[in-house]
């Protein structure tokens, strides 16, 4: 009997030891109200909103790299444009009847005003500081040559005068005037070449990486906010109460895993968002695929170049190129100094992130999105040809493209820089099989417990309105509450209204945000006279336009 008792006791001890070992090996669990995946501007913006709207919510941000804003949000990995359609010709397409559509331009400009208000509120609240470290006044210009393009720009300028958001824009076809605006663009140019330009003084250059750093630094001051760097998401599990258990690995601690249990999860991981969304298993993810495109820029830091160019000058996309691929020569403020960038030139890699894996594209291809990808490739062969031609460009080809915008450029003043990756959205379509979608898209489950941001353009410049839209989608009841409504109108004074068409409101908003963000702004005295719009633009032929992509 004693032997039997001893044996049973030994078995119990052994089983308990095994159980204790299993418990020790099981991933530890931490709890949080909100889990932000990705340390870029989108997660930082959403976290900043929620910290003010619902300060009792705990938040955790995880980032795979060893610091925030090291991918697409980094200033060197994007164009740094405060996209407001002041110069981007792709936002004002020509209709079949020859007229100019300004609807998208108005939408983009309205969205950027929301971002300006959001950043202004953060400066006034002490969340952000030293506006010149992240936003600076840089005039925005459109520049074209040739009769057809000049006529288009003239008609575009006239059409934009219908909107209060574009007051103060100037138009010129005079070589001397344009040379005064952008000397490098005009010096050495054929004096008989027909050219035209528009210029808006209130354009901006924005360092989205610096904005991200400042927002996250402020969030870290809160006891219930936790930042976990070098932390990779490994899996998702939906719980019975609709919360999520997300397994993550500590890449600096032998990839030790632990579980984060969150009531709401935001996937703001840039190019990696699609793959992570697929891993959640929500049916909404089945509608999407992604196609990665990279971008390169020529960079000059030579003071003789940099000090003689103070503008962002956008051109017209060449025939057969996507509208978004417009070349531009830009003043940038990076690492505390002025530089000039020209590009972009498209590149191809199967990586979804600059620091991603060559297996990203293949591993994101599923039985549900394979055919939509094939359909997009078949339907957009011009786009495929364009990307192939870009990949084949030589250094001489890129320099020749630069000389179209800077005729007296010298090769020794420029170096090539590889910027970030942009994953284009491909969405399943019942009629066409699959369509290429420009822009960003919020994808969430029907319960509103998890959401991801897919897409690339206009991206960071509209982070504030995009995250506002996300909250309206997943926190619908909260957003409708009097408490959140009051706070949202404090953060975004124009919330719930449109500035377009209201001159007084537009000027009030621009004056306020310019003062807080230390930007230049002079109220237009009178609406600029539209130039003679003859000859009229000819109706567009029934040709299929090249699909657009973000670079």
Swiss-Prot record:
Comp. bias regions, Low complexity: 525-544
This enzyme's EC code(s): 1.1.5.4
A Pfam family: Mqo
Enzyme class: oxidoreductase
Recorded metabolic or biological pathway in which this protein acts: Carbohydrate metabolism; tricarboxylic acid cycle; oxaloacetate from (S)-malate (quinone route): step 1/1
InterPro entries documented for this protein: FAD/NAD-bd_sf (IPR036188), MQO (IPR006231)
PANTHER family the record matches: L-2-HYDROXYGLUTARATE DEHYDROGENASE, MITOCHONDRIAL (PTHR43104:SF2)
NCBIfam families according to UniProt: mal_quin_oxido, PRK05257.1-1, PRK05257.1-4, PRK05257.2-1, PRK05257.3-2, PRK13339.1
Protein name, as recorded: Probable malate:quinone oxidoreductase
Gene source species: Enterobacter sp. (strain 638)
Name of the coding gene: mqo
């Amino acid at each position: 009997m004693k032997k039997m008792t001893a044996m049973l006791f030994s078995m119990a001890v052994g089983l308990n030891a095994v159980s204790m070992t299993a418990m020790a090996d099981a991933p530890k669990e931490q709890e949080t109200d909100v889990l932000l995946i990705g340390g870029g501007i989108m997660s930082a913006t959403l976290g900043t909103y929620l910290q003010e709207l619902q300060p009792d919510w705990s938040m955790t941000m995880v980032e795979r790299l060893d610091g925030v804003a090291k991918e697409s949000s980094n200033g060197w990995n994007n164009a740094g444009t405060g996209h407001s359609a002041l110069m981007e010709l792709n936002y004002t397409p020509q209709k079949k009847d020859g007229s100019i559509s300004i609807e998208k331009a108005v939408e983009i400009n309205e969205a950027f005003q929301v971002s300006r208000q959001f950043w202004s509120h953060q400066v006034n609240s002490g969340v952000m500081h030293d506006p010149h470290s992240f936003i600076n006044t840089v005039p925005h210009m459109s520049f074209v040559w040739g009769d057809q393009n000049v006529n288009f720009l003239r008609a575009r300028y006239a059409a934009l005068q219908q909107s209060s958001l574009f007051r103060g824009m100037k138009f010129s076809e005079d070589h001397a005037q344009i040379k005064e605006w952008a000397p490098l663009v005009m010096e050495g140019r054929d004096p008989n070449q027909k050219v035209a330009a528009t210029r808006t003084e209130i354009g901006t250059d924005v360092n989205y990486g610096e904005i991200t750093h400042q927002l996250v630094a402020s969030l870290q001051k809160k006891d219930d906010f936790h930042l976990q760097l070098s932390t990779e998401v490994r899996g998702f599990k939906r719980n019975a109460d609709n919360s999520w258990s997300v397994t993550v690995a500590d890449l600096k601690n032998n990839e030790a895993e632990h579980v984060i249990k969150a009531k709401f999860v935001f996937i703001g991981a840039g190019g990696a968002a699609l793959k992570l969304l697929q891993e959640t298993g929500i049916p909404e993810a089945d509608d999407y695929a992604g196609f990665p495109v990279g971008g390169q820029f020529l960079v000059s830091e030579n003071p003789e170049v940099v000090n003689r160019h103070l503008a962002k000058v956008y051109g017209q996309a060449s025939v057969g190129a996507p509208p978004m691929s417009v070349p531009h020569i830009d003043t940038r403020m990076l690492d505390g100094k002025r530089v000039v960038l020209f590009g972009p030139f498209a590149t191809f890699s199967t990586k979804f992130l600059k620091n991603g894996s060559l297996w990203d594209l293949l591993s994101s291809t599923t039985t549900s999105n394979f055919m939509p990808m094939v359909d997009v490739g078949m339907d957009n062969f011009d786009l495929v040809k364009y990307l192939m031609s870009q990949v084949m460009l030589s250094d001489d080809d890129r320099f020749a493209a630069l000389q179209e915008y800077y005729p007296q450029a010298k090769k020794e003043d420029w170096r090539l820089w590889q910027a970030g990756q942009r994953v284009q959205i491909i969405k399943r379509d019942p009629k066409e099989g699959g369509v290429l979608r420009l822009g960003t898209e919020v994808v969430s489950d029907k319960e509103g417990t998890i959401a991801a941001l897919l897409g690339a353009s206009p991206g960071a410049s509209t982070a504030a309105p995009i995250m506002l839209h996300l909250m309206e989608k997943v926190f619908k009841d909260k957003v409708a509450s009097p408490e959140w409504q009051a706070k949202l109108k404090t953060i975004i004074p124009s919330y719930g209204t449109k500035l377009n068409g209201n001159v007084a409101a537009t000027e009030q908003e621009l004056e306020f945000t310019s003062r807080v963000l230390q930007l230049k702004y002079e109220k237009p005295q009178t609406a600029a006279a539209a130039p003679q719009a003859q000859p009229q633009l000819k109706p567009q032929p029934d040709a299929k336009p090249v699909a657009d992509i973000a670079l």
